[in-house]
Amino acid sequence: MNKFAPLHPKVSTLLHGADYNPEQWENDPDIIDKDIAMMQQAKCNVMSVGIFSWAKLEPHEGVFNFAWLDIILDKLYAAGIHVFLATPSGARPAWMSQRYPQVLRVGRDRVPALHGGRHNHCMSSPVYREKTLQINTLLAERYSSHPAVLGWHISNEYGGECHCDLCQNRFRDWLKARYQTLENLNQAWWSTFWSHTYTDWSQIESPAPQGEMSIHGLNLDWHRFNTAQVTDFCRHEIAPLKAANASLPVTTNFMEYFYDYDYWQLAEALDFISWDSYPMWHRDKDETALACYTAMYHDMMRSLKGGKPFVLMESTPGATNWQPTSKLKKPGMHILSSLQAVAHGADSVQYFQWRKSRGSVEKFHGAVVDHVGHIDTRIGREVCQLGEILSKLPEVRGCRTEAKVAIIFDQQNRWALDDAQGPRNLGMEYEKTVNEHYRPFWEQGIAVDVIDADVDLTPYQLVIAPMLYMVRDGFAGRAEAFVANGGHLVTTYWTGIVNESDLCYLGGFPGPLRNLLGIWAEEIDCLNDGEFNLVQGLAGNQCGLQGPYQVRHLCELIHIESAQALATYRDDFYAGRPAVTVNAFGKGKAWHVASRNDLAFQRDFFTALSKELALPRAIATELPPGVVATARTDGDNAFIFLQNYSAQNHTLTLPQGYRDCLTDAAVSAPLTLSAWDCRILRRHA
């Protein structure tokens, strides 16, 4: 077998659980025993404990109370339930803010925060670092060998930035280490524009609405600095935990669509990835677009650790209370969306939270146990049903996703694109564009890794780089080597425009990729909303492109150098100009798509490439609209998750040799999937 090792030797199956906050119920101690009995009923085998417990653990400075936590961990262990034990830095006690105001953040507008909320501490504060070191050390010394503890949940949803004097000084120190001299910094930031040249390090301030926000290199470096800050703070939290027991793995929960930090760098501090997923199901009539978006983020979380299974640390079995509408999941959707995570590489399904809070800001957030106090509810029964399903899938734990396709979704590129001021200030739609390129593979059941531009390209047959506006040093050389050795690279409009400082490449776009792509991009036309062009395949083109395909937003005007045109624009003054090209390069090919084309184009183009490269599919059958197949494998067996994201039943024909993972019965064709249904099949690999 070829599986990843479990998170902990105690773990032999998939995990099922939730955030558990027993400190909220200290005035009703009978609830704890009732909760644990219901956890067993739902086949939960893990709980995240202590995430926001600092005020309970240290009610007064230097006065610690661990007795309640001792009881909780012992009771959970006795019931066969493991624990991700949290460090409590996500929210600090009021006494700390009152006595040490330097732990409070200062906003971008330079206004200090008051005590309240969460995730708003200054990561530069020596006091906060001292206090987190102290509480983490005590937790590690007391619990790192507790038999219930599987690993550490570091803080919670790190986010945000601080602009206090301490952070300004750390930022300047970070810049000195990066650039060495002010001359180098001024050159990288092109600060001669508008006479913004710096003559002393003390003149540099973080971006501010009443100060400097026009230097894009500064803005980029501020993002990078904040990533370095949180990574350093995370390592600071981890150090005493590893000192007590180096074998316990550590994680912190990431978030979807998150903008503040570069998760690729923060991931290096962690042993495994966990994240919080809250799709707004049933917002649109067609669920497939959201299902595709969510699948892409699952794939990114898996890719952050080279394909290692991740933990779905938070989700909701019902509705959230912080999104615009608190829409209930239709019957079956909770199980379907949870199994989607497992299909894409999760070895757990967990919720926020186990029991609904009685008061405060998330009292109406979905949970397993509602205010009624039991799980004989629609949601409770679905959670129990999912627990039963997960308990029957021990073979899936640790299985791999074998992706021969990678799509680059690069956070530094995202920051630079959004800040560039042109060519489309209405929004460059980077995430949406990446997902539009991901979708044809998801629909066909072709596995995809979602990577950043610094990841090794050699494991893949096909790499797609939508709008890789920023090409950092080294990427072009690696891309050329990848294609020369037989790989296929697809780029798009607005690629190869700037370097890592957001300085435009001179000598013609796409900059250092010009030789590989065999084109020169002279101009780019931004279409008004509601304005469209068309792209038409040339007769006999090697992809079989036909069309016309509708084009929106962006049309790049390119010249052929060594490439071959496959399709051209049909309208406007650039009618007849190349719109899709391919350049033979060594043993491989470099493709370029010069315009933002419709889904029909994406399907035709990437289906052609998939056939040319004989990319493996999860299952060799035609899938009806709304039905997708996702596979994991242990090397001997493949586990196929057939998912129906529509409100209609669908019937499909299966090849021979499949068995149902839950019943071990042979699966005969045709197979019918009910609305919001998921079937898990096994075949010999």
Regions picked out by a protein language model, each given a short descriptive name:
Residues 16-26, 52-67, 114-133, 155-162, ...:
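The substrate-binding groove and active-site-proximal loops of carbohydrate-active enzymes
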Residues 25-40, 132-138, 255-265, 330-338:
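Short, acidic/polar
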